[in-house]
């Protein structure tokens, strides 16, 4: 797909405003030449002031050019989104809320209720933030804010998914250490994405995946205390999230770009991973009843 961004998008009112400030000619589609006032008795001082004013006006035009181009690029990207972008997460958000309420209400202990509530809340936040960002038509500034929230929510869901499994299956130092690693890593990841919003995918996608596999360090503890089925669901959910991260990073496969592209494949895998973890947490929770 080719996205053509024009440079001649100034409105008549903007051009009139530039000419009112002394711009009379056009070069390459933008008004660049200026009339310089006679310095008169002020001599060189007046000429310097005129040059400074002209430079300021040229800078203003350049800023407006950049804003125009960014706006046009953003609009083109919005138009190029697959038609199903965001709908999977939009549909999953209310389902995750209902499923979370059921899980919390059936949890027999305060620890299981806490873990289930954190898991459900982080999932609802992620799916809601993702759907809001992808389904709306936002200004570039608003889209940047929503993107930060969306990416931060991924870290929260990783830590939120660890929490109930850790509270249910681990104890002692292993429980404390894994919770600190999960939530400390999530906090660091959120700070990283908020500060470096333009980081390339190949930089931040492995960070998500690495944090998602911290549990491997505690594999013996999970197998020692947890039913095999529960640990299998934990691992399967992690694999699905990992496959989703790989698809997101590589932008492949991209089956139907106009309807269901690589990003929709990524979203589908995240929904499947959430459902898998939900089943694992449910099995572990109901086993305590």
Label for each model-derived stretch:
Residues 5-7, 29:
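Compositionally biased, low-complexity segments
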Residues 7-10, 23:
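Aromatic (phenylalanine/tyrosine) cluster motif
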Residues 14, 18, 23, 28-289:
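Multi-pass alpha-helical transmembrane bundles in non-GPCR membrane proteins
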């Amino acid at each position: 797909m080719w996205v053509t961004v024009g440079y001649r998008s100034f409105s008549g009112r903007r051009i009139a405003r530039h000419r009112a400030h002394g711009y009379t000619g056009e070069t390459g589609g933008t008004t660049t030449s200026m009339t310089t006032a006679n310095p008169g008795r002020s001599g060189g001082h007046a000429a310097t002031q005129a040059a400074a004013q002209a430079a300021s006006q040229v800078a203003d035009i350049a800023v407006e050019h950049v804003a125009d181009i960014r706006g046009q690029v953003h609009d083109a990207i919005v138009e190029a989104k697959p038609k199903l972008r965001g709908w999977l997460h939009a549909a999953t958000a209310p389902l995750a809320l209902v499923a979370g309420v059921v899980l919390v209400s059936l949890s027999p202990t305060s620890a299981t209720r806490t873990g289930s509530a954190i898991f459900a809340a982080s999932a609802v936040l992620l799916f809601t933030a993702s759907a809001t960002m992808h389904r709306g038509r936002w200004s570039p500034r608003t889209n940047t804010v929503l993107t930060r929230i969306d990416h931060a929510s991924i870290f929260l869901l990783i830590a939120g998914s660890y929490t109930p499994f850790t509270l249910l299956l681990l104890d002692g130092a292993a429980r404390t250490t894994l919770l600190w690693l999960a939530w400390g890593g999530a906090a660091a990841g959120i700070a990283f994405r908020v500060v470096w919003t333009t980081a390339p995918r190949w930089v931040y996608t492995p960070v998500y995946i690495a944090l998602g596999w911290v549990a491997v360090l505690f594999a013996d503890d999970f197998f020692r205390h947890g039913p095999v089925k529960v640990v299998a669901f934990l691992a399967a959910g992690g694999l699905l999230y990992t496959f989703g991260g790989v698809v997101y990073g590589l932008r492949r496969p991209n089956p139907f770009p106009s309807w269901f592209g690589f990003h929709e494949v990524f979203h589908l895998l995240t929904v499947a991973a959430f459902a898998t973890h939900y089943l694992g947490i449910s099995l572990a929770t109901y086993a305590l009843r």
